[in-house]
Amino acid sequence: PPSFILGSSFFYKKGQQLDVGVLRTNLVQAGYGSVEQVMAPGEFCVRGGIVDVFPMGSQAPFRLDLFDDEIETIRTFDTETQRSGDDIDEIRILPGHEFPMDEAARNAFRSAWRETFPGDPNKSVVYKDMGQGIAAAGIEYYLPLFFKETATLADYLPADTLIVLSGDVNQALTRFHTEITDR
């Protein structure tokens, strides 16, 4: 839902005060992984006064250079060479997943799973992985177990947006429905 995306997004700009410990906690709770060297979206690395982060949806990762607890510069960088690139004034970091991964959310997911699906939940890899904080492949199909209300793409668009459908929409919907029910 838009409320989750907005509530789990972070904005940083040059000159801003930054508590690296809070940043690290926020990134982990938003679904980012702490690594030795940032190479792919959803990863971050803290080395002294340097924070590298590759936001979801971004074409390039960013390097925040800190002077004490203030963001001195924000630059893009090359993952292969690790060389800094363009200077940026501010960045937006979106959540790493479309769903929360904190302990309360994982517990709510598991509770909703038990209410929704019959049988022993411990026989499900998805259920067990979520208990360990692992987002299994295809977890996004279980989004309604994380939220009381979900959203569609249309919920993010202005009310007067014109939507044009091309091709055989009914066939695509039938194929998608079959794929989902076969899981």
Q: What function would you assign to each model-found segment?
A:
Residues 1-183:
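ASCE RecA-like P-loop NTPase motor cores
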